[in-house]
Each structure stands twice: as structure tokens, then as C-alpha cells.
């Protein structure tokens, strides 16, 4: 098992890694939309969703796989009313066959974020 690190996405100084590579799977910790330069939250559900999915792409590539190999995604939303916008952007990044997925509304996300996504991906053989 190895921890993922990256200088291409914002990484908080907290007691969990960006992700873990274990066996033939990559497990990414939940990603929120922080400006990569400042670490401050990005405004707006569209911009946040784009940033989160872009960060996921980058991290998976650094782990030796791609977003095409995501097998499971969990999306946490501050408001389920944003699901239509999120789905439209999600479809730009994920391709068929789509990964298994859950989307849930939560009462609060860190730093007033609108979205957080965590994924599991298979390593490329």
C-alpha cells in the first residue's frame, strides 16, 4: 500500500492522504474544490464540480490509471437541487459504462463547499 502525493492539486495538512494505492485499486479521499494556488474554496457549483473532477483526473493519472477506470463514485452535495448541473458536468468526464455511483445530500460540507466527490478506480494492467 502506498499514499498518493501530488504537487499538481491542493493538499491540506490533515491526517489523511490524497489517496491510497492498494493492490490493483486506487482509493481517492473526498475531493473538494480549492483554488490550487491559494487553497481557498472556489465559488459556484459548476466551477466546483469542474475543479473536483479535474483534480480526480490528475490524481488518477499520477497513480498510474485514468478517470476511464473509475469503478465507483460517491458524490456529496450540499443541495440535491444541484444534481442536474452536476450530472451534466459528470458526463463530460465519465464515459459509458458509467461507474457505480451514489449521490447524497448532506447537511454540511467543510468550508461551505457545495460538492465533494470520492472515487475508487482500477489500475491499468
Label every model-predicted segment.
Residues 1-54, 58-63, 68-71, 77-125:
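N-terminal presequence-like segments and the immediate start of the first folded domain
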Amino acid at each position: 500500500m502506498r499514499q498518493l502525493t501530488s504537487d499538481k492539486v491542493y493538499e491540506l495538512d490533515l491526517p489523511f492522504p490524497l489517496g491510497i494505492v492498494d493492490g490493483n485499486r486506487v482509493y481517492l479521499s473526498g475531493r473538494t474544490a480549492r483554488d490550487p494556488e491559494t487553497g481557498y474554496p472556489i465559488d459556484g457549483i459548476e466551477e466546483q464540480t469542474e475543479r473536483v473532477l479535474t483534480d480526480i483526473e490528475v490524481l488518477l493519472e499520477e497513480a498510474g490509471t485514468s478517470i476511464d477506470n473509475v469503478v465507483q463514485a460517491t458524490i456529496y452535495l450540499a443541495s440535491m437541487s444541484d444534481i442536474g448541473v452536476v450530472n451534466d458536468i459528470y458526463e463530460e468526464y465519465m464515459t459509458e459504462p458509467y461507474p457505480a455511483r451514489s449521490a447524497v445530500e448532506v447537511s454540511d460540507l467543510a468550508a461551505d463547499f457545495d460538492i465533494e466527490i470520492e472515487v475508487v478506480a482500477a489500475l491499468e494492467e
